[in-house]
Each structure stands twice: as structure tokens, then as C-alpha cells.
């Protein structure tokens, strides 16, 4: 797959080939929730940070985890150049919160604990930017 667009701090667009046919898909980064763009500076910061981690047309590897209620593919997204996990980097940097669900991986809990302890990003001051699901 290849990145085509970064919509916000936890959603990207990508080209994939399925059955020999290319198609555009939306991927929602699994296990995390970044502030919404409409939430102001933290939503914009999350998107900007994600754009620094991955450039347009860059090759990505994905581990699929189903679909969300909007029909987006839920996936852990890795850069193929170094297999860096984008969701973990967003959480560790304080640009996204852990999305609480039964399948959340321990590494995400650890990354959020580190970000909170460092008061990184969204954890620097309290507010709805720490809980995007409540904002929606």
C-alpha cells in the first residue's frame, strides 16, 4: 500500500491493489484517537505530526483489525522503511490518546503512560483534547 493523503491525526488515505485492481481506501489508525481538526490546535498538531512521520506515496505495511462504523479499515500502520508504528509514535508523542477497546495492545498502554508522565502534548494541560471521543 502507498499513502495518498493524511486526513487528520488518525486517518489516512492509501492505494492498495486488490485482485489486480488498484483502489483508494481510508485507513483509521487502530487503538488510538487523535483530537479532531475542529478541536483547534491539538487536532492540527496531530495531523501535522503524522505528516512528518509519513510522506505522500510512501510505502506502508498494515495489520488489519476490521472496520469502524464509518466503513474505514482499522489498521496498525507501519512505515516499510523502518517498520515504525505510526499509532504508537502518535501516542508516545502526546498527539493521540489510547482508544479504549478490548483488543488494545499493551504497547499502547505503555506509550500513553510514558506520554502522561512526561506531560507530552495533549497531556500538558487538561481538556477535551485528551478525550476526542467525548468531544464528538
Features from the language model and the residues they span:
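Small beta-barrel nucleic-acid-binding modules, primarily SNase/OB-fold domains
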Residues: 1-136
Amino acid at each position: 500500500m502507498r499513502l495518498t493523503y493524511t486526513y487528520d491525526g488518525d486517518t489516512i488515505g492509501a492505494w492498495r491493489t486488490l485482485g489486480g485492481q488498484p483502489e483508494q481506501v481510508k485507513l483509521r489508525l487502530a487503538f488510538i484517537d487523535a483530537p479532531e481538526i475542529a478541536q483547534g490546535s491539538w487536532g492540527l498538531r496531530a495531523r501535522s505530526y503524522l505528516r512528518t512521520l509519513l510522506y505522500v506515496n510512501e510505502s506502508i505495511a498494515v495489520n488489519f483489525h476490521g472496520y469502524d462504523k464509518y466503513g474505514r479499515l482499522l489498521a496498525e500502520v507501519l512505515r516499510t522503511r523502518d517498520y515504525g508504528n505510526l499509532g504508537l509514535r502518535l501516542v508516545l508523542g502526546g498527539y493521540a490518546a489510547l482508544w479504549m477497546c478490548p483488543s488494545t495492545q499493551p504497547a499502547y498502554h505503555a506509550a500513553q503512560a510514558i506520554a502522561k508522565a512526561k506531560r507530552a502534548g495533549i497531556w500538558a494541560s487538561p481538556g477535551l483534547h485528551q478525550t476526542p471521543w467525548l468531544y464528538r
